[in-house]
Amino acid sequence: MIMHRSDQALAIRALRSAAPYIRMYKGKTFVVKAGGGVFADPQATRSLVEQIAILHHFGVRVVLVHGGGPQLTELAEALGVPTRLVDGRRITDQRSIDVTAMVLNGLINTRVLGMCRDLNIEAVGISGVDAGLVRAHKRAPVRLTADGELIDFGFVGDIDTVDTTVLRKLLDNGLMPVVSPLSADESGTLLNINADTVAAAIGAALQAEKLILCTGAPGILGSIDDPRSLISYTDLNGLKRLREEGRIAAGMLPKAKAIEDAIRGGVRRVHVVSYQSAEGILGEVFTNEGTGTLIVADVNALTPAEQQSTP
């Protein structure tokens, strides 16, 4: 590839700027969660995996957790299986759990592994069922709606424990786990778990340096319909205020809960970035300005410089 001198200078400046972060994060663990939306777009998928490949080759221990909601809905409709979501969470009956396994463990996981092979990432596809990675129980019916309707989520699980043994063995051997959020109870009954929830639990169990949530939005927005209202950083109290004010709703609700769980579980920093940006992850991790939203336990722990431009 021929590079003009101006481009060479720009690339060198970028490397120099990123060098402190590369040194800082070498050997650290990042959990990256990508929703099914990214996998509906081959170019977005490639861009995401290319960025993860760079992290991997820089020595970051990456665990990739993927969703598959749009693909699951599409296949369910094609098979005549009805879809219902409550507060951003899918109700999963017996037919739906079969479709879920087909999409998550079969379609999405395998496609990601194929992309990893193309980009020279040694990756291994697993689910929460494998080696008892995610142990869960079937969620009891709960009242969530405004009218007090009792909601039975069906074959949806709530996490009991995360056993990171298999993840650590893979990471210690230079392999990148690609995790489907499917789990099972102690009797082996398959359970669907929100991918944000699984990513947060894995991040906490690994005491990850970062949890990175890749979404269709540029980050957390002050105004849901205005992408220019990006919030550069906030903390748990700020997140709570946004939820109380109704500025976090629908599909962002599980993400907000996952962010809180991850930080309270020991993850230092959570980032919400856009998968639609070709440099969403790298720009967030390796620049002072960032590209999305940083969430920490308490913004007062950030330095003034960090509060102006946060890596």
Descriptions of predicted regions:
Residues 1-277, 282-283, 289, 297-311:
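Nucleotide/pyrophosphate-binding catalytic subdomain
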